[in-house]
Amino acid sequence: MEVQCGGAGFIPESSRSSHELGNQDQGIPQLRIVLLGKTGAGKSSTGNSILGEKVFNSGICAKSITKVCEKRVSTWDGKELVVVDTPGIFDTEVPDADTQREITRYVALTSPGPHALLLVVPLGRYTVEEHKATQKILDMFGKQARRFMILLLTRKDDLEDTDIHEYLEKAPKFFQEVMHEFQNRYCLFNNRASGAEKEEQKMQLLTLVQSMVRENGGRCFTNKMYESAECVIQKETLRMQELYREELEREKARIRREYEEQIKDLRDELEREIRRARMEREFKEREAIFTKNQQNARKEVENTSMILELIIKAWEIASFIFNQFMKD
């Protein structure tokens, strides 16, 4: 099966096959969310709050606890909820080899593209340094990505009795400019919340994400680099699926030979039928394993180091530039 690779643009989910979305033959829709922000903004804690369990390492630390892009999956409202936590790869001024690798991993884990890019910013003293980090992220993703972005303000509990609108009115001008960039699409989060408050803020955020997805016509954010990476992932997924298919055929041929060898020496017809029934059961067992392997092939591909090398090679051939990696 040949995989055709197109150009940049917005990808409607309905136009993609199930294995492109990582759910071969299951038909489960995905909602892919990426956490972006400066080191120490609280991305990992936010990811844990969204997923409802501690799956990302988080804590108070001067250095980033998250060292590599990590992907965790849960279910919500009949969808596969995919959350990708990113390290401080967007803090670096000039991407080095490690940064390039993490950018590649980020694209591989979110391909064919995220539905929502959450820029995590803690409430409090929004400094010029923090503003520069925010602008760097916005610049790297380009104007096209704004339609898919939500400003997620953490440390809601620090507001205490202060009204959020009053807080925003008194915020520095450059922070208000960021709010304008996001068309006032923001959500407040308290990562220390528990019980009803925790569930309510999760519902508010995911409802906002769903609303944004509808506004975007059910499309995910993509561009030429995503298209190139998705093409590589699809090709490798199909290659792995074909290897599993060949393995199944070899196994079935071996089982058939063994049982036919046994059956030919049997004179009792009932015993022959029993052996044939056993053979069919073994066939079904192998086919069940094959089906599971087929469904998980894409996830296997995404988790190999080889796929990162293949994507980087494809990007080098296409002359993509890492420090402009998300621009149109």
Swiss-Prot record:
Q: How is it modified after translation?
A: Phosphorylated at very low levels in resting splenocytes. Rapidly and transiently phosphorylated in response to splenocyte activation. Phosphorylation is increased in cells undergoing apoptosis.
Region feature G2, mapped onto this chain: 64-68
Return the annotated region ranges for Disordered.
1-25
Region described as G3: spans on this chain: 85-88
Region (G4), start-end ranges? 154-157
**What does the record say about tissue specificity?**
Expressed in thymus (in thymocytes), spleen (in splenocytes), lymph node and lung. Expressed in B-cells and T-cells (at protein level).
The entry's protein name is GTPase IMAP family member 4
What species does this protein belong to?
A: Mus musculus
